[in-house]
Regions:
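Terminal amphipathic alpha-helical/low-complexity segments used for targeting or macromolecular assembly
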Residues: 1-62, 173-208
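Structural signal for interior beta-strand "rungs" in well-ordered beta-sheet cores
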Residues: 59-166
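A structural signal for small-residue-enriched, beta-sheet-centric alpha/beta enzyme cores
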Residues: 168-172
Length: 208
């Protein structure tokens, strides 16, 4: 892991990070990924028990559980790192951002690929669950508390339970300013009511 570039990624994504030293000493998310790199190396070199031991030690220290077999790219940022779960066959690209209580989980008890693959520059908002062996495309945004159960195209924004795509223009969003799915449904309902009222008025004018 290139530690310096990862620390810089934290500083870019978190306005509260005042210095690189602060990130290095105080950020649980960074510590969890450092432990993961050690655990993953052990796991890849057939020292699987030791790899699992390191990952469980890291879970107790940081509150973040990353299976040592998971594949994680460069400059991963875990902000407010508590309650993160990253499963055994999960894959994460470069420059991704995860907030607290995110789960990259599997479905079922089958062998083989069970967990999601995140592309590059993917943001997953707090409390979101991404469950299953599918791809989340580059530059995708998943809103807080969404539950995503199927593939997400690149440059898309997903909200809701179950998650659905509401934007595909690649506009930069964060986990606070993603669209409210209830508001979107209400706006659509109001638009339908207005159309019905206009049609009703037209029908009344014709009958007169």
């Amino acid at each position: 892991m290139r530690l310096k570039e990862t620390i810089e990624a934290y500083r870019r994504n978190d306005p509260a990070a005042r210095s690189g030293w602060e990130v290095f000493w105080l950020y649980n998310g960074l510590h969890a990924t450092m432990y993961y790199r050690v655990a993953h190396w052990l796991y890849e070199h057939r020292l699987r028990f030791l790899g699992r031991w390191v990952s469980q030690f890291a879970r107790r220290r940081t509150g973040i559980e990353i299976h040592p077999a998971a594949k994680i790219g460069r400059r991963l940022v875990i902000d407010h790192g508590t309650g993160i779960v990253i499963g055994e066959t999960a894959e994460i690209g470069d420059d991704c951002l995860l907030y607290q209580n995110v789960t990259l989980g599997g479905t079922g008890m089958t062998n083989g690929k069970r967990h999601p693959t995140l592309g590059n520059n993917v943001m997953v908002g707090s409390g979101a669950k991404v469950l299953g062996p599918f791809k989340v495309g580059d530059n995708a945004r998943i809103a807080a508390n969404s539950v995503v159960l199927r593939e997400v195209p690149p440059n898309a924004t997903v909200v809701g339970v179950p998650g659905r795509v509401v934007r595909r223009n690649g506009e930069k969003l964060d986990h606070i300013h993603t669209p409210d799915p209830v508001r979107l449904e209400l706006d659509a309902l109001y638009a339908r009511i207005e159309k019905l009222e206009e049609k009703l008025k037209e029908d009344q004018d014709v009958s007169l």
